[in-house]
Amino acid sequence: MFVDKTLMITGGTGSFGNAVLSRFLKSDIINDIKEIRIFSRDEKKQEDMRIAFNNPKLKCYIGDVRNYKSIDEAMHGVDYVFHAAALKQVPTCEFYPMEAINTNVLGAENVLSAAINNKVTKVIVLSTDKAVYPINAMGLSKALMEKLAIAKARMRSPGETVLCVTRYGNVMASRGSVIPLFINQIKQGKELTITEPSMTRFLMSLVDSVDLVLYAFEHGHQGDIFVQKSPASTIEVLAKALQDIFDSKNEIRFIGTRHGEKHYESLVSSEEMAKADDLRDYYRIPMDGRDLNYAKYFVEGEKKVALLEDYTSHNTKRLNLEEVKELLLTLDYVQEELKNA
């Protein structure tokens, strides 16, 4: 599917971009693909990536998704786009909501418009569980990003750019996530700061995140949203699992929820579950393709919305302490930190 094709990853110097490159370099994809373009703002991270991967098919472009001209020029000749550029720290976005809008909404508008303008074949937009029933600025901005993608998908004709969305739960050990924080606190002999012990979060690995995007890339139709079924854990169990793994006796201190945090997250709303396709490891939420001429739907009838439960970190499979430890030990990041402990 990537033979002689050019792929662009926006925000490509982040955890997801590095995971994609690592996957491709370990497979035949790197032999098939024509070029991988990393589009991001940080020249230092791009230089680090060039040195780390050392592959002539990797090309780095300095630019900002907030600037349409820079993303449009970088997208010339691109076949596929994985749009990962985002502001994702919930408390930060609470203090700077317009910055979240500028990157997550207006930046996404620029990426999608540039993709359509450059006749890109397919775009996969990376979203978050916080976009479902959003209560914080980050989630609201990502929800609007999803709406932008679906609205543009609805207006595409057959043969035009296909736009799909993937929703993530918490990606373990990704940049800015809680696992690196806990490990750092353990190594420094500090208290482990837990916001709310009963708070639950979905647990996805970086491998899972790449799997989800590649699944959506291979199977997605116009306007589809894809969600990977994931287990969950309470924050307290996650912290205790890391204590056991690192043989730590650090005290745990409860500090209360931060700005904009939810007690649990949702990956699929109850309304979406009514029309979702269960694909064993994934849910596919097809686009509502109706137009604004609602009169014909009243005449023809429309399948009513079923009263189904939403898919949340409270009602998915809950991992116990040993299961969380087993999952954490599969992460390369945790293994590296253990070696350096």
Curated annotation (Swiss-Prot):
One annotated GO molecular function: UDP-glucose 4-epimerase activity
Gene name for this UniProt entry: capD
Q: What is this protein called?
A: UDP-glucose 4-epimerase
> Catalysed reaction per UniProt?
UDP-alpha-D-glucose = UDP-alpha-D-galactose
Q: Which InterPro entries match?
A: CapD_C, NAD(P)-bd_dom_sf, Polysac_CapD-like, Polysaccharide_Synthase-Rel
* Pfam families, sorted: Polysacc_syn_2C, Polysacc_synt_2
The species this protein was found in: Rickettsia massiliae (strain Mtu5)
| Enzyme Commission no | 5.1.3.2
- UniProt record, GO biological process: lipopolysaccharide biosynthetic process
Disulfide bonding pattern of the chain: none
Q: Can you tell me which family this protein belongs to?
A: Belongs to the polysaccharide synthase family.
Q: Does the keyword Zinc apply?
A: no
Give the function comment from the record: Epimerizes UDP-galactose to UDP-glucose.
Keyword terms, alphabetized: Isomerase, Lipopolysaccharide biosynthesis
